[in-house]
Every structure is written in structure tokens, then in C-alpha cells.
Amino acid sequence: MSESESEKAIWTPLKIIQWAVPYLTQKGIFHARFDVECLIAHALKMDRLKVYLQFDRPLDPDELTVIRELLKRRALHEPIQYILGTREFFGHSFKVGPGVLIPRPETEQLVELAIEHLKDIPEKKRLVLDLGTGSGCIAISVAKALPCQVWAVDVSENALQVAEENAINNGVSSILWRKGNWFEALKPQDISQFQLILSNPPYIPLNEKPQLEPQVRDFEPKEALFGGESGLEAYENLALSLHQRLLPGGMALLELHANGLNRVLPLFEKTGLRGTAYPDLQGHPRVLKLEN
């Protein structure tokens, strides 16, 4: 849809959809229909389903300009979540943008397991550490589910700013934010051991980079995606002291690469931790539970 085309024709949401879906599909965008509807709704500042009620409403020039710019961004494979500025996770809305990893549905399993574990722990002993918090989706979802004290760590100042904003927007005030690399980010006045340690670390091997979708490979933060040549760098760092950071009877939950279990588990077994893997909906080991 060029500017000259938009000036001559009367464009409606339906006509935009009929034109833009094949256009984005040709550009290699999956779920193009859904994305187009979301972008129209975003431009018109309404719920996506309400767009259906206004399929035949003529769009004014300003609305067309906004929609055209949004479609251009999506055609370049910019993630739809970055364009919209939000991502739903565990029933909550999280702000996301460049420099912040987009929460994945697979990570909700880790949150579910965390909440189940904490239910059996007295409230005062619910001491939780989230390593590599990103948008804060894990820490905030756990803190919203039940009373607990959470420390959330990330090496990215940008990610921490977004995470803190997400906590405010979700009504969570029980999280202490720490900038730094893994356990090194904790301050001297912080506690040294936790009942529950959570992490969705970077675990994609660098040799898989060419196979990733452009919207992931070219836009999401590399430090949150790639775990070095082997994909194990983050786990190797965690294994150095994770066993010392767990309270007696404590537990860690780590997200895994679909093929990562047999390479990750031995790193922690060497330190005396016992591991149990939980499969995702595709049957791949997705969450590793570690206990002392």
C-alpha cells in the first residue's frame, strides 16, 4: 500500500486486511492475518475483536499513515510484540521493547512449578531469586500469585528499567532489583541463600543462529538468547555456586533448550544436586528442577 494508493482509494479495515495479509505472507511472516488485525487495532486504539465491528468504516488519512508505518515495520520482521509494546504472559500484561527478551509461553511452565513449590513453604521463608529477569515476567508472575520476597537480577540496565515498570503496572512491590551478572549482582546486605532460584538463561548455541527466525535473530537481545558456542556458558556459571545458594530443602528451576538436558544436568550433579526434568507440550525436557 503506497502513499499514492492510500490517497486515491477509500480504505477500510477489511480492505487493509485483504491487501496486507498476502503482503506480509509474501515477506515470510507467519500468522499474518492475526498480526494485521492486531496492528489495525493498535493503530485505532481499540480491542482486536472490535475491529470486526468496524470492518467497513472508512479510515481517515492519519489512521492510514499509522497503519502503513506499522505494516512496514512488521514486513521487516520486527517482532509484533515490540511494535505493540506489550506481551501477555501468565495472564498478565508486560511491556517489552528492544533490548528486552520477549516472554515465551513455554516459560509459564516454570512459573507454575515455582508457585506449586512455594505453596508448601511458610510465607516468611519464601525467599526467591530470579536470575536474568529480563522483562521481569517470571519474578512478577510469582510475586503476584502469592506473598513472597523476590530478588531479581539482570546484567542489562535497560531490561531492569522495563522490569521495574512492569512490576508497578502489575501492582507488585515485593521485588528487589539488582544489576549485575548472576550471583555477583547480589549486594552484601542481601541474603546469601534462597528457598527458590529461578532462571531462563540464554541457552541457544551460536551455531543455531542462522536457523532462527529473523524476528528473533535480528531483533531480540543476543545476550539473552545465546549461550556461547555450546549453549552452556550460562549453566556453567550457575553451576559454580548454585548449590551453595540454596537453603536446605531449597530448589532451583531452570529452563532448558529442547536438546539440553543431557548436557546441562551433569554440570549440577557434580556439585551434589539432584535433578528432575519436566517436559513441555511437545515432549521436550523444558524445565530442570534441582534439589540439594
For the regions a protein language model found, what residue spans apply to each?
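Conserved SAM/SAH cofactor-binding pocket of Class I
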Residues: 109-211
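Residue-level signal for inorganic ion chemistry
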Residues: 39, 77, 107, 138, ...
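Conserved hydrophobic residues forming the short capping helix/wall of the S-adenosyl-L-methionine
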Residues: 24, 118, 167, 242, ...
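Non-catalytic accessory regions of SAM-dependent methyltransferases
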Residues: 1-46, 50-52
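Conserved AdoMet
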Residues: 41-117
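Conserved Class I SAM-dependent methyltransferase catalytic core
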Residues: 229-290
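Conserved SAM-binding loop
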Residues: 103, 130, 152, 227, ...
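Mobile active-site "lid"/loop adjacent to the S-adenosyl-L-methionine
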Residues: 203-233
